[in-house]
Amino acid sequence: MSLSTPLITDSVIQAAHWLKKGQLLAYPTESVWGIGCDPFNQQAVMQLLTIKQRPIEKGMIVVTDSPSRITVLLEGLDAVERQTVLDSWQTDSINGTAKQAHTWLLPISQKLLITIPSWITGAHDSVAVRVIDHPLVKQLCAQMVSASNPYGFVVSTSCNPAGQPPALSLSEAQRYFLRHHANSNECVGYLKGETLGYQLPSQIGDALTGQIIR
């Protein structure tokens, strides 16, 4: 499809269809816009790494809709560690200005029926996971569940070229990537929506040590 007619939808089902076909997708998250793809599609991940100018060794964050999707990953934690992670994903009782998205590095379990690809874990023996709070993206993750992706994972990284601030709206996301790839055949789809307005930046922690990475 021509980049003069960008892929834009308000349908989660359509957006999931694009992801399953290897499309990159920009979408609203808790605080900023994110951009992602099917984490089990190596070509799509490599395309995303290229436009983000991100080294593969760093790994990628994935989001899902429910802790129940990743029970096997949470089993690698002790009771206290697991409860800390689960509590961080419960935001209903938190004041809006204090809400924060929490991503955790979870150890890779040997019990996984579907292995997490090396192009997602990077140089690490863990995977960075967040149960996302955004209702639209929760629905998107649920649509991504399949035999090859039982976790409902979608890659999630900030929607911006390297060196630029993350997009805060659909129009900003479009300006970044329609301009950035005007001379290439790479095309980004867009899922209409608004961020949840979280004011605090997202946080990344190591679930085993409790160390805050970012």
From Swiss-Prot:
Query: Would you identify the family this protein belongs to, as annotated?
Result: Belongs to the SUA5 family. TsaC subfamily.
Location of this chain's protein in the cell: Cytoplasm
Please report the name of this protein according to its UniProt entry: Threonylcarbamoyl-AMP synthase
Question: What reaction does this enzyme carry out catalytically?
Answer: L-threonine + hydrogencarbonate + ATP = L-threonylcarbamoyladenylate + diphosphate + H2O
Q: What does this protein do?
A: Required for the formation of a threonylcarbamoyl group on adenosine at position 37 (t(6)A37) in tRNAs that read codons beginning with adenine. Catalyzes the conversion of L-threonine, HCO(3)(-)/CO(2) and ATP to give threonylcarbamoyl-AMP (TC-AMP) as the acyladenylate intermediate, with the release of diphosphate.
Tell whether Nucleotide-binding is among the UniProt keywords: yes
Respond yes or no to whether keyword RNA-binding is given for this record: no
Enzyme Commission designation: 2.7.7.87
Q: Name one GO biological process term.
A: regulation of translational fidelity
State the species of origin. Answer: Psychrobacter arcticus (strain DSM 17307 / VKM B-2377 / 273-4)
Q: Where is the YrdC-like domain?
A: 9-214
GO cellular component, as recorded: cytoplasm
Checking Gene3D superfamilies in the record gives:
DHBP synthase
For this protein, the record's HAMAP family field holds: TsaC
Ordered alphabetically, the record's keywords are: ATP-binding, Cytoplasm, Nucleotide-binding, Nucleotidyltransferase, Transferase, tRNA processing
InterPro entries per the UniProt record, alphabetical: DHBP_synth_RibB-like_a/b_dom, Sua5-like_dom, TC-AMP_synthase, TC-AMP_synthase_SUA5
One Pfam family in the UniProt entry: Sua5_yciO_yrdC
- What molecular function terms (GO) are annotated for this protein? ATP binding; double-stranded RNA binding; L-threonylcarbamoyladenylate synthase; tRNA binding
